A protein has these predicted regions:
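Phosphate-ester processing/binding pockets and catalytic centers
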Residues: 1-279
Length: 279
């Protein structure tokens, strides 16, 4: 079994960048990380944003100690055998190029992380079991999206466990590690499109291992997406359009919501019997 742990990160107001990350490894790889992580963190469960900004549990700890904590935990990941990916999406670009678009950035990144987990599982020849941080905003919808993706793709069914799990980040060192990678992913993009442009040393250390990477989606990607939407090409690829969704809402008596959109995707996938395509 390959164990995959995930979390998300964003700027304080979730206005510029959002990212989702996963880190994967065999149990013995994870156990090595966990043993070192617990010793280094002591009684404070790690939270990347708070540690970096001296907030939350780190508010009354000297800045240099917090920076040393972050640096040491990054070093533990870099020296380990686990590997991961962070998917970051430029929310400012989305609002600029496709104003009024549904708030699907988190789920777009989440679904790509699921796909990457399946790739790792296939490469290692073992099924992947995914566990994410509990989020009152996204947990239910992420569960729906995972089920839709897995049920609609034979390769996903082969290499991904039937169910995704959710745990509180404070109770899982492994989710805390994914939180660090998610923080690095959104910072990497934010330092490209935001007011401060620089490369973080912590990210350079992780990237140098060639086991950690980030993908970013910004203006060029959203321009391509808008072109597909305007041309009708995307409709031909996915096999449905907005009118189909509205008709489904009317037939089922449902109101529009992200959850109902994912229920619709599950229904339409079964109807057209096509491979899954990311929303």
């Amino acid at each position: 079994m390959i164990y995959v742990y995930g979390d998300d990160g964003a700027d304080a107001n979730k206005e510029r960048v959002i990212a989702v990350s996963v880190i994967a490894g065999r149990e013995e790889w994870w156990q090595s990380v966990e043993d070192q992580w617990v010793v280094r963190c002591g009684e404070i469960p790690f939270h990347a944003t708070d540690c970096e900004s001296n907030h939350g549990d780190y508010e009354h700890i000297p800045n240099e100690e917090n920076k040393a904590m972050y640096r040491d935990l990054t070093g533990i990941l870099a020296a380990s055998m686990v590997g991961g990916i962070g998917i970051a999406i430029d929310l400012t670009a989305q609002k600029k190029i496709i104003p009024g678009a549904m708030p699907l950035a988190y789920y777009r990144a989440f679904l790509e992380c699921v796909e990457k987990a399946a790739n790792v599982a296939e490469n290692l020849g073992e099924v992947a079991e995914l566990t994410f941080d509990i989020s009152t905003e996204n947990e239910y919808n992420a569960d729906l999206l995972y089920s839709w993706a897995r049920n609609g793709d034979a390769r996903f069914r082969q290499w991904l466990a039937p169910k995704i799990s959710f745990v509180p980040w404070r109770e899982s060192v492994r989710v805390q590690a994914a939180d660090l990678l998610a923080f690095e992913a959104w910072k990497a993009l934010d330092h490209t499109v935001g007011p401060v442009k620089r490369t973080r040393r912590s990210w350079e250390l992780l990237r140098a291992t060639q086991r950690f990477e980030t993908y970013s989606y910004s203006e060029d990607w959203f321009r391509d997406l808008k072109a597909h939407l305007d041309s009708g090409e995307l409709e031909n690829i996915v096999g449905f359009n907005e009118s189909d969704y509205k008709a489904w809402l009317k037939t089922t008596g449902c109101q529009h919501s992200i959850s109902n959109l994912f229920h619709f995707l599950g229904w339409i996938s079964k109807k057209i019997d096509n491979p899954v395509t990311a929303p």
